[in-house]
Amino acid sequence: MITKILLPHDGTEMSKRAVDKAKEFAKAFNGEILLLYVIEDIPIPATLILGNERTWISQTKRSIAKKLEEGWMKMAQEKIISNLANENIKAAAKVLIGSDSSPAEQIVKFAKDNQIDMIIMGSRRLEHISSKIKALGSVARRVSEAAECPVLIVH
């Protein structure tokens, strides 16, 4: 039974389509949707990390991540979770901030740690190759290869 659906969301059109597909599954199985946004760590060149700048850079990175988190949570609540609630679908949102692991690894670990039954995510079309080619982005591919639960990738 599919009762816990993880929906990694990055704001792209493909992620918006994935919301619609997750909604179908949640309705069919009386499931809940957990939106997940991963904020990647911001790499800083070693040449910039000198003396007192290290503290300032760390504080600035935390400040940027916090603003991204607040903005995404506001968007998730106003545009996604409230719409799902209007359709009687239970939903929540979570943000993961900067880690040594990749976004795909964080998604897979989160799914395992939270006993997710299914992951539904957008494919992230590779625009620079051709607008006619629908290809998997690296995060979707890696999640589909590593996840222990079923993964539905939406084009």
Stretches found by the model and what they are:
Residues 1-62, 89, 146:
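Small/aliphatic-rich secondary-structure junction motif
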Residues 36, 92-96, 152:
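General small-molecule cofactor/ligand-binding pocket signal
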Residues 42-43, 101, 128:
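Generic structural signal for helix capping and beta-alpha/helix-loop junctions
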